[in-house]
Structures are given as structure tokens and as C-alpha cells.
């Protein structure tokens, strides 16, 4: 087991290095001058421009900028935002609860719905129910996030009276010590704040969780069909066990093992999908922060946010690999 864990951890190192190189290169190849965007055209002389470039370290060769950046990252310094002059880590962890809250509920409903729909589609194989679920999951997987979000805002939100953007309506003023709006609105005791926070979360969570729902549904259906054809399932039927008990207790438990392996990919999907989702719904999280940084050519924010998110995804995938190694010892050899 130790050898298996060591190999998995060792594989993370080249991945991390590749991410830093690719991120640094892509960020610096974005068209536009960050100094011009920061200062505007008014009062930006050649002397001021050169001074700002030197102050930000942008006048150095790219390889020197890269090694300087990596040296700071190793020390836990991700730099400061060009726009706000605040440390990137401080801004990231200030905004992260909003994204984490949205991603958690998107993952929760997509897991719950995907497992239920996938199981039903497998049990009702070759029926209209199975075909409908399969077609719906394919549609959900192919649907553009921005289009789906706009449809919900234009047609579903007015019908159900759901907020079209933001985490809480402006009529509510509460303290946010944790950054998690559901927790803070509950603790505040302000009448109607918690209900409004829940309503504000519904549409963004639906949009963000649609693609993961489709993935989990198809994965669960495929795994369940394979498990339901195993000999021990036929033995359980021969013993007279109820079909419901066979499906839930014996089949589903084993069918969920492959589903665990895609959780890491789903986390990556949620974090990447949050960029568009948060922009559509004016959700003040990491995704919207990244979009604003792209428009402002804020290199430290772009490099730091991508690196931190990539690290989170790597850690999640590593954890999933290790857990899968515990559940299924065969992959350790």
C-alpha cells in the first residue's frame, strides 16, 4: 500500500510543474498591456509606463519572471493583484466560500439525481423510461452552460419567483463571518434571509450541476447493467430475495465503485463550469473573479487562481485514487 501511495504522490510533481509552465505561458500571451489597462490612456507617458512595468516586474525576461514567480509560490506568496493590490491568496479565500457553496449543492443534487436516474434506467432496460433517461442525459451533457442559464433566467425564474442573480437580495443586510451565505443567513436571525439565500442558490446550482448529472447518470446506468448480469445477482434472485432489495443492497453498492472514480473529474467540471455560471448569475465567487482578471490582464490573479484550483483538483483526484485503491485492492498491483 505504501508503494502505491508513493507512486501516486510522485506522479503529482511533474503534473504540477507542467501546470505552472502552461499557466504562466498562456497568461503572458494574452493580448493587451496590463499597465495600459490599469492606468488608462490619460497621463500614461512612456516614462510612467516604463516605471510601472519595472515596479510590476514585467520588464524582466519571461524566464526570469517565471523562476521569480515559482520561488515566491514555494514560499506561499502568490503575489498581489494589479487592480486591488491585495494578496492573491487573501482574495481567493475571501471569494472561495461562494464558489464552494455553489459547487457543493450542484454536486449534491447531481450525485443524488444521477444515481437515482441511472439505477432506474438500468432496471427498466429497453423500456421507454430507459430511452428517455438516456436521451435526456445526452442532451444535458451537450447543452451549453450559458444557453441553459439564460433559458432558466428568462422563463423559469419569473414563473417560480426565483432570484435571477446574486447570493442574497439587496433588501437583506447581514454579516458574513463564514462566507457561506446559507450558514450566515441562518445565524443572522434576519427574517426571510435564509429562505432568500436558498432561492438564490437554486438556479445556479441547477445550471452548474446539469453536466455532472448527465455524466453520473450514464456512468451509473452502465455500471448497474454490468452488475445486474453477474452470477451473484442471479443467485440472490434464486434465493427468493425481493428485487428491490437485490437492486439497492447488492447491485447498487457494487455499481457505485466506478462512479467514485469520476468524482475527481466532476470536481474539475464544477470548478471550470463555475466561471460561466457565476458570470451569468452575477455570483460573487472565484469564477467571476477570474473573468474580471482576464479582462484586466491581472497576471498574478490569473496565475494564482489557476494554480490553486489545479492544486485542489490534483488533491481531489489523488484522494479518489487512494480511496479506490482501498476499495479495489486489485489496482494496487
Swiss-Prot record:
The gene is dppB. It is a multi-pass membrane protein. Keywords: Cell inner membrane, Cell membrane, Membrane, Peptide transport, Protein transport, Transmembrane, Transmembrane helix, Transport. It comes from Haemophilus influenzae (strain ATCC 51907 / DSM 11121 / KW20 / Rd). Belongs to the binding-protein-dependent transport system permease family. OppBC subfamily. Residues 96-328 form the ABC transmembrane type-1 domain. Part of the ABC transporter DppBCDF involved in dipeptide transport. Responsible for the translocation of the substrate across the membrane. GO terms for cellular component: plasma membrane. Pfam families: BPD_transp_1 (PF00528), BPD_transp_1_N (PF19300). It comes from the Bacteria. The chain crosses the membrane at residues 9-29, 103-123, 136-156, 197-217, 256-276, 306-326. One of its GO terms (molecular function) is dipeptide transmembrane transporter activity. It is found in: Cell inner membrane. Its main location: membrane. GO terms for biological process: protein transport. This is Dipeptide transport system permease protein DppB. The keyword Membrane applies.
